[in-house]
């Protein structure tokens, strides 16, 4: 697990929690929750890859792990679209920087999850 990615997640979550986007605060809270869920999922996949031979354990724990993987990729795509939309509508430079970093992080995490999942297959 890349320590820079972990600190990036923490930084972005902290920045997002400080934002006041008016009526869209529920949307932002939803994004924060999904970011946290995505981080936990990515971390658990990374740990499974680190423990060689853990594929069988992962499959035994959850026979639908491939389905979960597909759902996570859908969540990532949704988050990417939401972040892009927020980037288009916000005029505050602090928020723009935060959403740009969030977009970069999402793309990075998507690639990491793909790499982890290919190693598990």
From Swiss-Prot:
<dbReference type="GO" id="GO:0039675">
    <property type="term" value="P:exit of virus from host cell nucleus through nuclear pore"/>
</dbReference>
<comment type="subunit">
    <text>Interacts with protein M1. May interact with host nucleoporin RAB/HRB and exportin XPO1/CRM1.</text>
</comment>
<feature type="short sequence motif" description="Nuclear export signal">
    <location>
        <begin position="85"/>
        <end position="94"/>
    </location>
</feature>
<dbReference type="GO" id="GO:0042025">
    <property type="term" value="C:host cell nucleus"/>
</dbReference>
<keyword id="KW-1048">Host nucleus</keyword>
<dbReference type="InterPro" id="IPR000968">
    <property type="entry name" value="Flu_NS2"/>
</dbReference>
<feature type="short sequence motif" description="Nuclear export signal">
    <location>
        <begin position="12"/>
        <end position="21"/>
    </location>
</feature>
<comment type="similarity">
    <text>Belongs to the influenza viruses NEP family.</text>
</comment>
<protein>
    <recommendedName>
        <fullName>Nuclear export protein</fullName>
    </recommendedName>
</protein>
<comment type="function">
    <text>Mediates the nuclear export of encapsidated genomic RNAs (ribonucleoproteins, RNPs). Acts as an adapter between viral RNPs complexes and the nuclear export machinery of the cell. Possesses no intrinsic RNA-binding activity, but includes a C-terminal M1-binding domain. This domain is believed to allow recognition of RNPs bound to the protein M1.</text>
</comment>
<keyword id="KW-0813">Transport</keyword>
<dbReference type="GO" id="GO:0044423">
    <property type="term" value="C:virion component"/>
</dbReference>
<keyword id="KW-0945">Host-virus interaction</keyword>
<keyword id="KW-0946">Virion</keyword>
<dbReference type="Pfam" id="PF00601">
    <property type="entry name" value="Flu_NS2"/>
</dbReference>
